[in-house]
A protein has these predicted regions:
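C-terminal helical cap(s) of enzyme catalytic domains, especially alpha/beta-barrels
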Residues: 97, 175-212
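Alpha-helix-loop-beta-strand connector modules within alpha/beta enzyme cores
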Residues: 39-60, 99-109, 151-167, 204-212
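A C-terminal functional module that forms or caps the active site or interfaces directly
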Residues: 137, 144-191
């Protein structure tokens, strides 16, 4: 069974990031890279990590359409499998990401897992989701520490990929997220900050597989 685990490697030391990527790459669905890795190592880190696993660039793209297109085109050029974009900037900005993505999957943020998301993003989840579906997003980001919301979003977006952060350090459980309807579960600190990332990945894969 293919893994449903996406590991976020938000590390500021390139050797540590690549070391863990090399150890776990074959056991996960994808490795997620955020701005810390890019700021330290440059965009080439996308290609370097792609040697070990699919790469999802969690850039939460949120600018005017032209800038969004430039960012997305570069990420595609570097070989990423997917990119995460905000949707609150509107249909034209999200549409620019999707139009520039080629065969790269675009995941739209429609709900988040941290406390501050209750102020603006989460109250508008339904509108963001409906707009993102019309724009052609491949999938959505839903909070892994809120199984009820995962289930609700899954029902509203049948056939779309639901990817969930908020598992591990933010309190969510991988098995609960999968049982609620998540297709992919994102885990970061619980893996890369553990004394044995490989063992932690194996444990998470077992937990996820038992919930499928």
């Amino acid at each position: 069974m293919e893994s449903k685990l996406v590991v976020a490697l938000d590390l500021m030391k390139e050797s540590d990031l690549l070391g863990i990527a090399g150890k776990i790459g074959s056991q996960v669905f994808a490795i997620k890279l955020n701005w810390p890795a890019i700021l330290v190592s440059g965009s080439r880190i996308i290609r370097d990590v792609s040697r070990y696993s699919r790469v999802i660039c969690d850039f939460k793209v949120a600018d005017i359409p032209n800038t969004n297109s430039l960012i997305t085109e570069k990420v595609l050029e570097m070989g990423a499998w997917g990119i995460i974009s905000h949707s609150f900037t509107g249909h034209d900005s999200l549409g620019a990401v999707i139009e520039s993505a080629g065969d790269m999957r675009v995941f739209s943020v429609v709900s988040m897992s941290h406390p501050g998301s209750a102020e603006f993003i989460n109250p508008n989840t339904d509108r963001l989701l409906e707009m993102s579906i019309r724009a052609g997003a491949a999938g959505f980001i839903a909070p892994g520490n809120n199984p009820a919301e995962i289930s609700r979003i899954k029902k509203m977006a049948p056939g779309k990929i639901i990817m969930t952060p908020g598992v591990g350090a933010q309190g969510g459980k991988a098995g609960d997220a999968i049982h609620a309807g998540a297709d992919l579960v994102i885990v970061g600190r619980s893996v890369y900050a553990s004394h044995d990332p490989v063992e932690q990945v194996e444990n998470l894969n077992r937990e996820i597989n038992s919930s499928v």
